[in-house]
Regions:
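Membrane-interfacial amphipathic/re-entrant helices at transmembrane-helix boundaries
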Residues: 1-69, 108-109
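Short loop segments and helix-boundary regions at transmembrane helix junctions
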Residues: 2-13, 76-84, 106-108, 112, ...
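Hydrophobic core segments of alpha-helical transmembrane domains in multi-pass membrane transport
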Residues: 15-31, 68-72, 93, 97-99, ...
Length: 397
């Protein structure tokens, strides 16, 4: 096996190739439409990392995507397709808002309670899907899609209910300030505090002008924990065994049904806490009437596939995805190209990630071909040696 084929077999190679193909296809589309691809990609990169404020907004946008991406990746490793991440996220936002409005505890209690309730709401929605799968064999895609719509209409019901509706708006009441997880909330509420924040080198202006919060820290910890849980614990081993082959896992004594329910509960909990953190960490700290989904859960599917369903790999994948979404606005503003070009890039990346097995297959083909050529070369050398020996024998006679 050569160095090239070793590199080709690594999962990260498939991801890099998919990303390159995504930008290659976008280049062709932009050039065909009469736009300068270099200028467009320059605007995209500048919109992602051109200012500290842009970087902060990319991180903020990546936070829920990291949670939902890890949730989908985790379920996929156990052989389940959690397309209900969107609904579990919405349930998390709704119940976090309900508790955040009704309770006004000290921050040291309010924040954990609000996040815990959001997490439990998502976990309950996920566990229900897992239980229906384990008990009755109902496919998780069907039940989770139905729960997505239930979550949307439940969200609208809560917003429009008398207890939570904000007058003359399509929003709910905001949660109490004791539940906020934004950084330096008190300083942002005064002009002197804002001035002091902006004096902080490098990050001060970004913190002052964005909803920077603790969410990304929690999300990274969650991604690392889920990766550790899957690869380093008995529970994770059993879940992966269920994902590889349920019949074989059942035969070895693993409780398949319990693991299916537990997996979906954990996956839903990740989505629920993502929703809760968006309520506690982002203005206006409330939920709104939804005419359509916000796509945090559905975009999490793309993040998971770009990461090759690796929980830790979802960290850079979510940042890339969020950067494309946020920086894509600059492409439209600076170059005038439609923002749909970003969707083309993302779609192409996901498409080629789905074909990620092709590159390892190509590496295997190259190894077989090289081995065959080496064998033929050895055979040729052996035949030449035999011919030479025969010729020498005849000369001796």
């Amino acid at each position: 096996m050569t160095t090239l084929t070793k590199i080709m077999r690594k999962p990260i190679t498939s991801a890099i190739v998919a990303i390159l193909f995504g930008f290659f296809v976008a280049t062709i589309v932009l050039a065909s439409a009469g736009y300068d691809p270099v200028e467009a990609f320059g605007a995209l990169i500048d919109g992602m990392i051109g200012k500290p404020k842009y970087i902060a907004n990319v991180i903020i946008k990546a936070t829920p995507l990291l949670f939902t991406g890890v949730a989908v990746a985790f379920a996929f490793r156990v052989g389940l397709f959690n397309i209900g991440a969107e609904g579990q996220y919405v349930f998390g936002t709704v119940f976090a808002t309900i508790v955040g409005v009704l309770l006004d505890l000290p921050p040291v209690l309010q924040i954990p309670v609000v996040l815990l309730v959001g997490m439990l709401a998502g976990a309950a929605a996920g566990a229900l899907v897992g239980w229906l799968k384990a008990k009755f064999g109902i496919h998780e895609v069907i039940t989770s899609i139905m729960l997505n719509w239930i979550s949307l209409y439940f969200n609208n019901f809560v917003v429009n209910s008398e207890a939570f509706h904000k007058a003359n708006s399509t929003k709910s009441l905001p949660i109490n300030p004791s539940g906020y997880t934004m950084l330096f909330t008190d300083m942002k509420s005064s002009s002197d505090g804002l001035a002091a924040l902006k004096d902080i080198p490098v990050v001060g202006d970004a913190i002052a002008r964005t909803d920077a919060n603790v969410g990304i820290i929690v999300a990274i910890i969650a991604a690392i924990f889920i990766g550790w849980l899957l690869m380093r614990t008995k529970v994770g081993y059993e879940m992966r065994a269920v994902g590889f082959n349920r019949d074989a896992a059942q035969f070895t004594g693993i409780n398949v049904k319990r693991n299916l329910v537990l997996c979906m509960a954990i996956s839903g909990a990740l989505c629920g806490v993502a929703g809760a953190l968006n309520i506690t960490g982002l203005n206006p700290h409330s939920i709104s009437v939804l005419a359509a989904f916000e796509n945090y859960g559905f975009n999490g599917l793309s993040v998971a596939f770009i990461a090759g369903c690796s929980p830790v790999g979802c960290i850079p994948a979510s940042l890339l995805f969020a950067g494309l979404l946020y920086g894509g606005q600059s492409v439209q503003q600076v170059v005038g190209a439609p923002s749909e070009i970003i969707s083309i890039i993302i779609g192409t990346i996901v498409f080629f990630m789905a074909l990620g097995g092709v590159i390892p297959m190509l590496a295997e083909y190259l190894d077989r071909r090289r081995a065959k050529q080496a064998k033929l070369a050895e055979g040729t050398v052996g035949a030449d040696a035999t011919t030479n020996d025969s010729a020498q024998g005849k000369e001796a006679k």
